[in-house]
């Protein structure tokens, strides 16, 4: 699913469609057609959008043309039903910066 947000004054408002300067937030369930729409319209490499879906992805920074990818690992509560003693696990989060948009 795609959500679009833009700052107006000191508040962030949800938009109905993509506009220049907006934040694009991509959440499950992922639709291949929506991802392709973003890559084509913004010129983002598809792997920039999909790399953070890999639970084993490492934190890193990449630059391709004028598009930046930042992958960070953030802790979340381990909700696994196994008897694993680890209270927290880390999951990757991708942040893509283009000249006109932020994509998460």
Listing of model-derived features with the role each one plays in the protein:
Residues 1-104:
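Peripheral, non-transmembrane regulatory/ligand-interaction domains of membrane transport proteins
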């Amino acid at each position: 699913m795609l959500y679009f947000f833009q700052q107006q004054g000191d508040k962030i408002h949800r938009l109905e469609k993509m506009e220049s300067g907006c934040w694009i937030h991509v959440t499950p369930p992922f639709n291949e057609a929506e991802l392709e729409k973003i890559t084509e319209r913004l010129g983002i490499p598809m792997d920039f959008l999909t790399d953070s879906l890999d639970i084993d992805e490492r934190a890193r920074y990449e630059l391709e043309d004028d598009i930046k990818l930042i992958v960070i690992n953030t802790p979340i509560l381990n909700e696994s039903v196994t008897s694993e003693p680890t209270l927290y696990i880390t999951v990757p989060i991708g942040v893509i910066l283009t000249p006109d948009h932020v994509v998460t």
